[in-house]
A protein has these predicted regions:
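Generic protein-terminus/edge-of-domain signal
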Residues: 1-78, 82-84
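Short acidic-glycine-tyrosine-enriched beta hairpin
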Residues: 81-96
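Ligand-binding loop in jelly-roll beta-barrel domains
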Residues: 97-126
Length: 217
């Protein structure tokens, strides 16, 4: 079980996070298996939601990386026909281009963060190829799959939310700095063989491991 103190929210933060800093309307989802154009923040390639609606998001895909953090109650996400039953505190990273759908709690209750962001700004960094390979399939991060790094990873994402809803003039830069910390931490442990096989999507097979070995050679 994930320690709840790492991701619990005060009522004041809930109230703050319900409102997008720059967007009046809610998230728009495309038709089943259609491309979704993420409504990014102006002059940025990211968007964060504090989501408490029981809506079901039909099968779709986009060029952005999607990260889902369950905060209260369960949340079911299907990525490329693999089903993930997220528990409070679980982090699921969905890679760009992956078909996925989201099913809310059947009782209509639940809270979660949904992050959408593009990482192409890091592609010019030679070492970033290791990150792309480590996250080429869906990745589940929690206290069971990644006990050595879970506290760091969930703390970084909660910091992302605080910065996103702050009035910092450099908040986008701060968020990308935090995201880079998140991906570096996981990738370092992945390359060192410290990540549980349960963290990686079952779609990750020997071909994926071979790709990593090729990068390291």
């Amino acid at each position: 079980m994930n320690p709840s103190y790492l991701f619990s929210l005060s009522e004041s933060k809930r109230a703050l996070y319900r409102n997008q800093p720059d967007l009046a309307q809610g998230r728009q989802i495309s038709e089943p298996e259609e491309y979704e154009h993420p409504p990014f923040v102006e002059n940025a390639a990211l968007r964060l939601w504090y989501n408490e609606q029981p809506d079901r998001y039909m099968t779709h895909w986009h060029n952005a990386t999607e990260m889902i953090v369950a905060l209260e109650n369960c949340y079911t996400v299907t990525v490329q026909n693999q089903i993930f039953h997220l528990q409070p505190g679980d982090i699921l990273v969905v890679p760009p281009g992956a078909l996925h759908s989201i099913q809310g709690n059947p009782k209509g209750e639940g809270y979660r963060f949904i992050f959408l962001f593009e990482l192409t700004i890091f592609n010019s960094m030679y070492d970033f190829r290791f990150v792309r390979s480590a996250f080429s399939n869906a990745v589940l991060i929690n206290q069971t799959t990644c006990p050595d790094i879970y506290e760091h990873e969930i703390t970084v994402l909660m910091q992302c939310a605080e910065v996103y809803w702050s009035d910092s003039p450099i908040r986008i830069l701060q968020i990308y700095s935090l995201l880079l910390q998140f991906f570096i931490c996981y990738t370092q442990n992945f390359l060192a063989g410290k990540i549980s096989s349960n963290a990686q999507s079952q779609l990750a097979n020997s071909d994926h491991k071979t790709a990593i070995q090729t990068l390291l050679s």
